[in-house]
Amino acid sequence: MTELSSEARAIVEGRHSDPFHYLGCHRETDRKVVRVYLPDASEVRLIDETGEEIILTRIHDAGLFLGDLPDRAERYRLRARYGADLVELEDPYRFPPILDDFDLYLLGEGTHQRIYDKLGAHPMAMEGVDGAGFVVLAPNARAVAVVGDFNFWDRRRHPMRVRGNGYWELFIPGARAGDRYKFAITAQDGSLLPLKSDPMAFAAEVRPNTASIIFDQARLPRPTPLAATINARGVPISIYEVHLGSWRRSDGNRWLSYRELAETLPDYVRELGFTHIELMPVNEHPFDGSWGYQPTGLYAPTSRFGSPEDFAHLIDACHREGLGLLLDWVPGHFPDDPHGLGRFDGTSLYEHANPLQGRHLDWDTLIYNYGRTEVVNFLVANALFWLDRYGIDGLRVDAVASMLYLDYSRPEGGWIPNKHGGRENLEAIEFLRRFNREVFGRFPNATTVAEESTAWPQVSRPIEFGGLGFGYKWNMGWMHDTLSYFEKDPIHRKHHHDQILFGLHYAFSENFILPLSHDEVVHGKRSILGRMPGDDWQRFANLRAYYAFMFGHPGKKLMFMGAEFGQEREWNHDHALDWHLLDQARHQGVQAVVRDLNKLYREVPALHEFDCDPAGFEWIVANDADHSVFAWMRKGASGRARCLVIANLTPTIHRDYRVRVPFTGRWREALNTDSAHYGGSNVGNDGAIETSGEIIPELVLTLPPLGVIFLVPEAA
């Protein structure tokens, strides 16, 4: 055996950053030399295009072989002996690069909108040879190799080469869709890191296994398109929030698959009148108890419920029912599981190195470094990926407040101010603006929603006017105030009248969604029904009234699964909803009132056209605290598009209650939550009522106990 050069030694020791510089075919003065590294092979032959075989010389026991390629030959294959077996294979180090110069330029700038076409693992053919191309970012690594089903998980066999800006790549002949793989990374100090999953993996193993899976994105079907106005501010938007693992389950408490869900979920949601489904995070994640909010695979739909094609099938099933599909998206933090993004290349690549910036104290997770162009590119492209490849209709961004504030949930002295000495995360602000700019730039009919729990201004206002550029914002203040009010015994509500009034002072400062989300039915808060006071009759009456109050209030609507039929228990992600409750009439009544509220909301323009515009709202009765009565007029674009909403939030019937209205004539009682159909006492106004009063028209009404009524003027 000859003494190895320093370059050959680096190959054998797995620390060469450009194995192509040594391996493969190279012209040396007057000959073409082929160097091959095949650990454990006892003999290697080179087969040129004519079929001629050339025995390569073994130059090191580690598996280095050397030989000459005839000048006439352009391509070659290898035949290697492993024990008694002869194996024909292609040499990965004879193929051209995967990334071109333009890719490298855009990646360096951090402006490559379609990194999912290049990074990760892609089945492809090079020079007529089938295989898969692998590209990964690891700028501070000494060496990176691909390990997987195609090479016995041996980190010696497929070292990658580094290109510009720290992107490593390799085409591996014979690797194919369905193969599992990971990256074996050597840090600069020579230490071997835990095998890493691919940050750009498009599929992954079911937990607790953590390997990435090669997936061909060309297999994804294109979903049925929806109307361009599906997310517009002037249309009804009523969202059903779902956790796929616990909506329903099969025998033995087994999860339903994406395809099983596609057979039932969209039809159920459409039949109840919702316009959208919002899925809690489906990105791959290791811990069931995180509900998906601690993802390790942003580009892979979780394999718990099936394949990427199966998930695309579920989206298409929603679209075929006319339902928009929103995904919860988590660009704020990620877990520090060893196979994940944390210290990916031996350094804090995706996260801040300083724990005062890089670790979230509430969740013990890592925080993305929005000051790195590669990280921002990775996240923004991920949002575009779901819209482009899967055809979803929008993204709800989780925990925006934790991104915006450097001192979020941190003690005094436990955070680092920005360059101006303030607590605003300037890099996160720019990231969110870029995210919205690029989403709406490429997908103008999509929407984005912010879960932002503070009073940060202009979250859903245009970027050019100083806003963050979101389409909508969750109205957390409305949710807290109204739940607090409705939880109180009706006898005390008159002392808290302002909790209802206050929300209208800011109801149009943003494009709001009124959220009754999963966060309100966990951690000891009880279910929505469980928070309602009184005996059983009053609890259900309060619940129906609360939902009607929500649908009559300005703002788009969101309801977490189970709330639509009065789930009694808190939500538990390990079990299905209590569907057996629908055997009881009172729960059927709750479901029926939600169905009818959705129908009314869709069909009455006054209830949705100006959801986000003060022109669509007028208080009629705001100061009757003694009776806990509220009345307001919702207005639409046309002159007679009106809907009067009246809420009596005590168990006392109020008769001869006078309310002024803009039009004389007959007003139809479009919905009454106290109807016997819903389980109420059937107190109301016989379905319609004529105005009285010659100068100022008014309605003399009977207000049902713990009830809300909707009245619309009949055609003149």
From Swiss-Prot:
Keyword Transferase annotated: yes
GO molecular function: 1,4-alpha-glucan branching enzyme activity; cation binding; hydrolase activity, hydrolyzing O-glycosyl compounds
Protein's UniProt keywords contain Cell membrane: no
Highest taxon listed in the record's lineage: Bacteria
Catalytically driven reaction(s): Transfers a segment of a (1->4)-alpha-D-glucan chain to a primary hydroxy group in a similar glucan chain
CC terms in the record's Gene Ontology section: cytosol
GO BP: any one term: glycogen biosynthetic process
The EC number(s) this enzyme carries: 2.4.1.18
TM segment ranges: none
List of catalytic residues: D398 (nucleophile), E451 (proton donor)
EC main group: transferase
UniProtKB keywords: Carbohydrate metabolism, Glycogen biosynthesis, Glycogen metabolism, Glycosyltransferase, Transferase
CDD domains per UniProt: AmyAc_Glg_BE, E_set_GBE_prok_N
Pathway assignment: Glycan biosynthesis; glycogen biosynthesis
Subunit annotation: Monomer.
Family in the record: Belongs to the glycosyl hydrolase 13 family. GlgB subfamily.
Function as written in the Swiss-Prot or TrEMBL entry: Catalyzes the formation of the alpha-1,6-glucosidic linkages in glycogen by scission of a 1,4-alpha-linked oligosaccharide from growing alpha-1,4-glucan chains and the subsequent attachment of the oligosaccharide to the alpha-1,6 position.
Name of this protein: 1,4-alpha-glucan branching enzyme GlgB
